[in-house]
Amino acid sequence: MGKIIGIDLGTTNSCVAVMDGKNARVIENGEGDRTTPSIVAYAQDGEILVGQPAKRQAVTNSQNTLFAIKRLIGRRFEDAEVQRDVSIMPYKIIKADNGDAWVEARNEKMAPPQVSAEVLKKMKKTAEDYLGEPVTEAVITVPAYFNDAQRQATKDAGRIAGLDVKRIINEPTAAALAYGLDREVGNRTIAVYDLGGGTFDISIIEIDEVDGEKTYEVLSTNGDTHLGGEDFDSRLINYLVDEFKKEQGIDLRNDPLAMQRLKEAAEKAKIELSSAQQTDVNLPYVTADATGPKHLNIKVTRAKLESLVEDLVKRSMDPVKVALEDAGLKVSEVNDVILVGGQTRMPMVQKTVAEFFGKEPRKDVNPDEAVAMGAAVQGGVLAGDVKDVLLLDVTPLSLGIETMGGVMTSLIAKNTTIPTKHSQVFSTAEDNQSAVTIHVLQGERKRASDNKSLGQFNLDGIQPAPRGMPQIEVTFDIDADGILHVSAKDKNSGREQNITIKASSGLNEEEIQKMVRDAEANAEADRKFEELVQTRNQADQLVHGTRKQIEEAGDKLAANDKEAIEKALSELEIASKGEDKAAIEAKLQALVEASKPLLEIAQQQAQAGAGNTADATDAGAKKDDDVVDAEFEEVDGKDKK
């Protein structure tokens, strides 16, 4: 059985880890980095770039460079959060036929799981390069506050990338697993504050250790799936745009190229201000008008940045209070606070969390890597490599159905340990009703329409009876991934209907299979492209080497041979510019054949050279016989010895 890898599929960066003996090891990617930007770019020649290469070309290809896709996964186009992103993202967010938020690049419409699959493929390849064997199974993390639709969409992304997703695990829970892996923790209650690139989570977790066996029980979880580092960046970008407009009278929002440069500069400035009190945002030639080029140079202090994002940091504390209340704990009962996610490096975030909990957060957990490491631990548990670890996670939001009067009736309350199953009997609202619609909802509001609709199905064939008489048993079954299966059964007739709640990413099985096939076709195309490039490189080397040999041969090469070689060289150079690998290989072989006279000349020169060397050696030896050994003095400074 191969390794089950752990992947932290982040909004801004992604990370992959694997169990190496008893420890989780983060794997460096092809660029030598331990994290990979979650950025996918579609180049003009059809090439798909992922990670750092995609980030590097974003300035000149902003409309086809997709980032922060996780904020769209499993969401409807009409969602308020999506509409907010539509107005600020440089790429196109569109409404799919089924009402979901999709994206468009190079005139191709794509579902967010399709784009995320490209990042997962890079993570998969990173692991395969390190392990030296194919990887087919993974544990992928999601924000704890992701709803059912977002979890299913993440699972779909894994399938499109060619991965069998063994488990979807909550990010804070994964961080807790990493924290407890190599520590004697005893019995402790920890708070995991996870502020990443696009999402925020807080989980209160109890770790019990008995005879070396650790049980991680999530007591409660809460969060905001649209609050993260990207929002902090946006505040700083808007400030810089407004300042530049005051100085120069030009609104950079109308210039996509300038905005992309500004985005990179703002992100860099934000990071610098975590360690420095002040930084310069300096962008020469950021734009131009009739009077000439314009340069942006604005000083930003840490205090200024903090004033811009203060309300965002405060906003993150509301879910923290709710999570503690749901867990039935006082602040003083939390033993340790763990910070996860790159945005927690901001001093203001650390200070706010420390003040709330009355203790300094732990600094010995890497905020960028802990989640992937925890996912690898869970992979090890599932593979049987890691023993003595039991994980009890929870469902983040209440689940129920719409009942008479547009009310949501909960069947499973939020923070219920999963997997779990719950049944409840309902009846008809009208006399002789022959069918009922089961409308499945997720959320905490009483009004059904205020909650997230996960899907609906009909149970028909109910025998005519007065209202309230038929007995319809509705069963909710949540698996270990937090994904919901719903069934409804007419207890009188025995008729049953069930549904696995599909993500509102709306990808049906056929669409997923098509995307899987497309991904496989791309992998084949990538392999062929790589082989073509290798053949071109061979051709270039041979052309270079042959020209050098022609030069060295000089007059020794017959004119007709030289002409034949030059012709073969020219044909190979033309073939190398094409896309036909077989044609390049044929011309390579033709040049090798035509160059045989050059090989003969080189051999003759080598033999002649060897003969001359032998003569010189004999003469040297004869000369040595006449040499007299001289006496010598070793001189050190002025003293003779």
Swiss-Prot record:
The modification Phosphothreonine is found at residue 199. Pfam families: HSP70. Induction: By stress conditions e.g. heat shock. GO terms for molecular function: ATP binding; ATP-dependent protein folding chaperone; unfolded protein binding. Gene3D superfamilies: 1.20.1270.10, 3.30.420.40, Actin, Chain A, domain 4 (3.90.640.10), Substrate Binding Domain Of DNAk, Chain A, domain 1 (2.60.34.10). HAMAP family: DnaK (MF_00332). Acts as a chaperone. Belongs to the heat shock protein 70 family. Residues 604-641 are annotated as: Disordered. It comes from the Bacteria. Keywords: ATP-binding, Chaperone, Nucleotide-binding, Phosphoprotein, Stress response. Residues 604-619 have a biased composition (Low complexity). PANTHER family: HEAT SHOCK PROTEIN 70KDA (PTHR19375). Signal peptide: none annotated. This is Chaperone protein DnaK. InterPro entries: ATPase_NBD, Chaperone_DnaK, Heat_shock_70_CS, HSP70_C_sf, HSP70_peptide-bd_sf, Hsp_70_fam.
